[in-house]
């Protein structure tokens, strides 16, 4: 079964309970179970986990369990390094603080223990045990105490630092904390003098830096390319360098210098001058401790240059002090060996040249410095002129003047000046090197003056050197083959340059020199001879060389003219090749960069895919764990409920008391139930056995024993009662005696105090008299002040009450005014509401009246439309019957005319006499048509005089009956018949005149409609949409009659009208609006009594249709006039209601 896991807050409470009962290990196990479960990573925030973590680390520190603390810290980092970095920082700092406090307490305890041991016995300080321990182990009491008490805590603190550094080394959010902990670790090593731990710490930090540099191209983690990271690493290495110098670990200091130089070279930003000055200062110190005087002087020179150029507030004394330091360090450099190539025979990892080149890189020099180059640089910077007179003389004596007899004496004066001057404390380490350089200068200068010299004489000249040191220097000079020296101990002499065949190099002295050595002169004899002979030849033949030069010049010029074109082409070709090569290289580089970019993109894509896959796997793993945790929680809950249920019974408590927590966690619900049943059975068996044993004991023997015990118990109780009475009486007697004695003492005390009564009474009387006079004075003052205050308050109250009454009066007056204004306002508002209500009722009445008029008008319009429709149907039927009759009559007279193509006059008269009958019938039919048209037109007039919607209704009616209108209206005569019409007829003389008159009528009609539609008052409830009868595309009364009907009878004389050509009718056709206006005009003209049209003479032409129709004058009906007035009146007042509806 899975292990039981508590919630974090419950685990914290349980851990506190274990700590209170003195079980910290059990408390740590309880908290560790929570961390190992990992369930809290996804369910709780840092506010819940942080107290738990502090308690967990506290227990780890108390129990010195650094590995357990590391596990918890790593779990906490994984949870909160991206969520709440401050919480992680607080936890780590708190952990380290607790470890440091315990370590300091252990140190204090160790010192106290040693002090106690030392002060234990002053008469016997050296005990036999201490003597034996010191002889065996070689340690004192303090060392042994530290090893026993302090060392475990030091080890724990060191492990804590290492764990925190390992924890934070790849977290970009905790870089500052990482470097702070590194500095704390350096301080730890300094405080407890842990050199081996300091070396391991340096190696660890260097390894971390290498890992950062290797993984700098990754998208996550710490990147060395960031400026902040570089600065933090640089500051940490500078602190490491200071700590290494303090602990005198020069190898670690040199490695730190290499790291610092690498970081400064990697940074794109130039380090600040302060950092560079600190770097050069520490570098010079490391070189000095390493015994490398050459690079020590070079570092000081770089520091001097930097300070002189960038420090603006540099005083003259500081500049002189720094210049003296640089000059003395440079002059203290040992004279270089003439044959450093001997070092190549010594097996080493790196040659001296490579080492020197590496050190020069640390100083930012292009090549390793030499003593000569440094002295030249010192002179260039005018350093000898900046120092004091003594140091300037030192430079001249060593590097300029040639005076071997007084050299050591002069240098000894400078040495004494340095040793005696307190301000020259920094220059004291250079004294021995300066003496060695002086001795070497002395030997070289002596070798140029003497061939041999006595040892004693040389010792006199070298005043600060003994015979052994001098001999050692001589041997070193010979060893490096710098000089030819032979020591003759038998004669106690020294010989210089006696062998003239041993000069193997060109001697170039770097200091003051008088002449060359004899061996050097022999070696350069041929060279000198060549030089002298060349000079002699130039003097004997002064023009030979000039002629040779001119001849050589002419040859060169001629040769140049011969090859200049070829060389020019070659140069151009070479330039072209170079350009092509550059283009090729550039293309190769571009291709390589593109390939690299593609490769990096592919790697990045693969990395993203891998990261995505990893995240998916982690998500799946989390889901799986969460599912397992849920199942585990359910099981644990059921187990907990089962345990609680069992613990409520006596046998269950007994069964659980036999099991510890680990045992309970290992069991499941079934096993616990099984244990419970077993416990019940066992208790039942024990109860049965107890009952059986009791049955055996309850017998007569037991009763007899108890009967015998009764007298004994009675006797014991009687004796005990007597003893208790005696004890009470004695105690009571003692109490009474004590009370009597106390009363006697009290009475005696009272008698002694009674003698003080007179004095007491006198004192009280005097005190009362004094206080009474003071009381009377104060009472009078109080009463006077009270009376004044009472008068003042009465006056103030009078004034205040007057003001209150005045304010009350003004307030009542103002309230009365406001009340009256409010009444007036309410009355006005009531009147306005009544007026508004009356206006509203009036408007409603008017609206109702308009609505009734509109309904009445609408009923009239519907009646007119119904009549128009009935007339149209009737006219259509009459026209159809008339057409049939016309067809029949045409068929009757046409054959008769055809039988007599050349008839006589009488026959012609007979044929013509038949026409009037037809004409009469036609006239009657035309009269009916005209009457029908009159009715239709009158109906149209009524519709047109109506409102806007009525006009549109009439227009729609005319459009719908387009065919019928064209059938019953009076036909237009041909042009020839109109021309033959009588002059006195009322018909128009021509088609143009007729059209013009129709247009005037149409314009009048539109103007009349515009006057009727004008609204002289305000328009209410009006829809301002576009009016269909005023459309800009159709005009006021324009209508589209469409194509003419093809079944319309033809106007030509003779023949069938169906066979007539259409183009003739199309040419004579007029616009529909014009034809309508003409028909209206003709109809109204007939009503006004105009004369009917008459045919011209001889106009019959054999076709009865060409005869003019006879029209009768019809007076206008009074009913129609009255209806027209009523419609017009209704239209003037109620057009808005019609439009709205």
UniProtKB/Swiss-Prot annotation:
PROSITE patterns from the UniProt entry: PCI
Biased composition (Basic and acidic residues): 588-623, 829-899, 920-976, 990-1051, 1059-1087, 1110-1131
Gene3D superfamilies: 1.25.40.860, UVR domain
The keyword Manganese is annotated on this UniProt entry: no
GO molecular function, one term: mRNA binding
InterPro entries per record: EIF3A (IPR027512), eIF3a_PCI_TPR-like (IPR054711), PCI_dom (IPR000717)
Keywords, alphabetical: Cytoplasm, Initiation factor, Phosphoprotein, Protein biosynthesis, RNA-binding
Domain (PCI) ranges: 319-501
Region described as Disordered: 588-631, 829-1141
Phosphoserine: residues carrying this PTM: 908
GO BP term, example: translation reinitiation
GO terms for cellular component: eukaryotic 43S preinitiation complex; eukaryotic 48S preinitiation complex; eukaryotic translation initiation factor 3 complex; eukaryotic translation initiation factor 3 complex, eIF3e; eukaryotic translation initiation factor 3 complex, eIF3m; multi-eIF complex
Subcellular location: Cytoplasm
Known role: RNA-binding component of the eukaryotic translation initiation factor 3 (eIF-3) complex, which is involved in protein synthesis of a specialized repertoire of mRNAs and, together with other initiation factors, stimulates binding of mRNA and methionyl-tRNAi to the 40S ribosome. The eIF-3 complex specifically targets and initiates translation of a subset of mRNAs involved in cell proliferation.
Family affiliation: Belongs to the eIF-3 subunit A family.
Oligomer status and interactors: Component of the eukaryotic translation initiation factor 3 (eIF-3) complex. The eIF-3 complex interacts with pix.
Protein name: Eukaryotic translation initiation factor 3 subunit A
Gene (UniProt): eIF3a
């Amino acid at each position: 079964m899975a292990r039981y896991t508590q919630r974090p807050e419950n685990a914290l409470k349980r851990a506190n309970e274990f700590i209170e009962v003195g079980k910290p290990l059990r408390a740590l196990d309880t908290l560790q179970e929570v961390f190992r479960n990992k369930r809290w990573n996804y369910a709780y925030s840092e506010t819940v986990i942080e107290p738990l973590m502090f308690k967990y680390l506290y227990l780890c520190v108390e129990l010195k369990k650094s590995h357990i603390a590391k596990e918890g810290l790593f779990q906490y980092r994984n949870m909160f390094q991206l969520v709440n970095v401050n919480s992680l920082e607080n936890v780590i700092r708190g952990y380290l603080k607790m470890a440091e406090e315990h370590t300091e307490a252990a140190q204090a305890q160790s010192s106290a223990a040693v002090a106690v041991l030392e002060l234990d016995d002053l008469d016997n300080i050296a005990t036999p045990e201490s003597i034996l321990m010191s002889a065996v182990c070689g340690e004192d009491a303090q060392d042994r105490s530290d090893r026993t008490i302090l060392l475990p805590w030091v080890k724990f603190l060191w492990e804590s630092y290492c764990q925190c550094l390992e924890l934070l080394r790849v977290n970009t959010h905790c870089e500052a904390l990482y470097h702070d902990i590194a500095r704390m670790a350096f301080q730890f090593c300094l405080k407890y003098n842990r050199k081996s731990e300091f070396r391991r710490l340096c190696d660890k930090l260097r390894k971390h830096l290498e890992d950062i540099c290797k993984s700098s191209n990754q998208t996550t983690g710490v990147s060395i390319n960031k400026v902040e990271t570089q600065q933090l690493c640089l500051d940490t290495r500078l602190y490491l360098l200071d700590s290494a110098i303090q602990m005198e670990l020069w190898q670690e200091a040199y490695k730190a210098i290499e790291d610092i130089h690498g970081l400064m070279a990697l940074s794109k930003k130039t380090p600040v001058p302060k950092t560079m000055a600190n770097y050069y200062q520490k570098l010079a110190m490391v070189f000095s401790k390493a015994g490398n005087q050459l690079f020590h002087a070079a570092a000081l020179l770089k520091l001097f240059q930097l300070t002189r150029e960038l420090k603006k507030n540099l005083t003259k004394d500081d500049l002189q002090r720094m210049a003296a330091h640089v000059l003395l360090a440079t002059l203290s450099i040992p004279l270089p060996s003439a044959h450093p190539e001997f070092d190549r025979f010594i097996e080493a990892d790196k040659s001296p040249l490579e080492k020197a080149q590496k050190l020069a890189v640390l100083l930012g020099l292009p090549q390793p410095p030499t003593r000569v180059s440094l002295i030249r640089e010192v002179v260039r910077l005018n350093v000898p002129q900046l120092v004091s007179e003594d140091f300037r003389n030192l430079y001249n004596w060593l590097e300029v003047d040639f005076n071997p007899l007084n050299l050591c004496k002069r240098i000894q004066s400078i040495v004494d000046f340095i040793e005696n001057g307190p301000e020259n404390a920094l220059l004291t380490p250079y004294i021995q090197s300066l003496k060695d350089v002086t001795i070497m200068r002395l030997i070289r200068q002596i070798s140029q003056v003497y061939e041999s010299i006595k040892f004693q004489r040389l010792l006199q000249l070298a005043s600060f050197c003994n015979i052994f040191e001098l001999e050692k220097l001589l041997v070193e000079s010979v060893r490096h083959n710098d000089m030819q020296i032979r020591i003759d101990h038998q004669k106690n002499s020294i010989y210089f340059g006696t062998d003239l065949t041993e000069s193997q190099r060109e001697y170039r002295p770097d200091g003051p020199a008088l002449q060359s050595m004899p061996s050097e002169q022999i070696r350069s004899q041929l060279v000198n001879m060549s030089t002298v002979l060349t000079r002699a030849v130039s003097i004997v033949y002064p023009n030979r060389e000039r002629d040779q030069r001119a001849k050589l010049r002419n040859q060169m010029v001629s040769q140049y003219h011969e090859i200049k074109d070829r060389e020019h082409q070659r140069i151009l070709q070479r330039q072209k090749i170079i350009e092509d090569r550059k283009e090729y290289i550039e293309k190769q580089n571009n291709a390589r960069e593109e390939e690299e970019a593609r490769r990096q993109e592919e790697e990045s894509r693969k990395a993203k895919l891998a990261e995505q896959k990893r995240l998916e796997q982690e998500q799946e793993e989390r889901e799986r764990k969460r599912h397992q945790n849920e199942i585990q929680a359910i099981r644990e809950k059921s187990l907990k409920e089962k345990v609680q249920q069992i613990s409520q019974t006596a046998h269950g408590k007994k069964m659980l008391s036999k099991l510890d927590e680990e045992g309970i966690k290992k069991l499941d619900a079934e096993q616990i139930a099984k244990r419970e049943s077993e416990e019940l059975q066992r208790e039942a068996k024990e109860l049965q056995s107890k009952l059986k044993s009791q049955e055996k004991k309850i017998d007569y023997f037991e009763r007899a024993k108890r009967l015998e015990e009764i007298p004994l118990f009675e006797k014991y109780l009687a004796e005990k009662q007597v003893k208790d009475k005696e004890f009470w009486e004695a105690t009571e007697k003692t109490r009474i005696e004590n009370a009597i004695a106390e009363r006697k003492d009290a009475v005696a005390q009272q008698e002694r105090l009674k003698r003080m009564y007179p004095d007491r009474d006198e004192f009280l009387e005097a005190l009362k008299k004094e206080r009474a006079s003071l009381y009377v004075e104060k009472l009078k003052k109080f009463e006077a002040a009270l009376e004044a205050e009472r008068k003042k308050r009465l006056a103030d109250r009078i004034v205040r009450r007057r003001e209150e009454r005045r304010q009350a009066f003004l307030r009542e007056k103002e309230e009365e005014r406001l009340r009256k204004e409010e009444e007036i306002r309410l009355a006005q508002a009531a009147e306005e509401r009544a007026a508004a209500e009356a206006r509203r009722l009036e408007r409603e009445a008017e609206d109702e009246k308009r609505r009734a008029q509109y309904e009445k008008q609408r009923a009239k319009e519907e009646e007119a439309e119904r009549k128009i429709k009935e007339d149209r149907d009737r006219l259509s039927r009459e026209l159809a019957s008339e057409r049939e009759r016309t067809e029949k009559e045409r068929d009757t007279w046409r054959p008769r005319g055809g039988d007599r193509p050349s008839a006589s006059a009488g026959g012609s008269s007979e044929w013509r006499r038949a026409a009037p009958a037809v004409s009469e019938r036609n006239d009657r039919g035309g009269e009916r048509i005209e009457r029908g048209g009159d009715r239709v037109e009158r109906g149209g007039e009524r519709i047109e005089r109506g409102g806007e919607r009525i006009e549109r209704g009439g227009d729609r009616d005319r459009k719908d009956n387009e065919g019928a209108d064209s059938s019953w209206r009076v036909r237009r005569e041909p042009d020839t018949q109109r021309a033959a019409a009588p002059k006195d007829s009322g018909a128009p003389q021509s088609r143009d005149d007729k059209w013009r008159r129709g247009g005037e009528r149409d314009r009048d009609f539109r103007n009349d409609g515009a006057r009727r539609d004008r609204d002289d008052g305000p328009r209410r409830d009006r829809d301002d949409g576009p009016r269909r009868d005023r459309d800009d595309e159709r005009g006021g009364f324009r209508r589209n009659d469409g194509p003419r009907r093809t079944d319309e009878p033809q106007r030509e004389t003779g023949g069938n009208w169906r066979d007539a050509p259409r183009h003739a009718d199309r040419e004579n056709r007029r616009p529909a609006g014009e034809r309508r206006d003409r028909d209206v005009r003709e109809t109204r003209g007939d009503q006004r009594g105009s004369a009917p049209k008459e045919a011209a003479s001889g106009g019959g032409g054999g076709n009865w249709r060409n005869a003019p129709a006879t029209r009768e004058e019809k007076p206008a009906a009074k009913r129609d006039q009255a209806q027209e007035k009523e419609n017009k009146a209704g239209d003037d007042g109620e057009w808005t209601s019609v439009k709205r509806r």
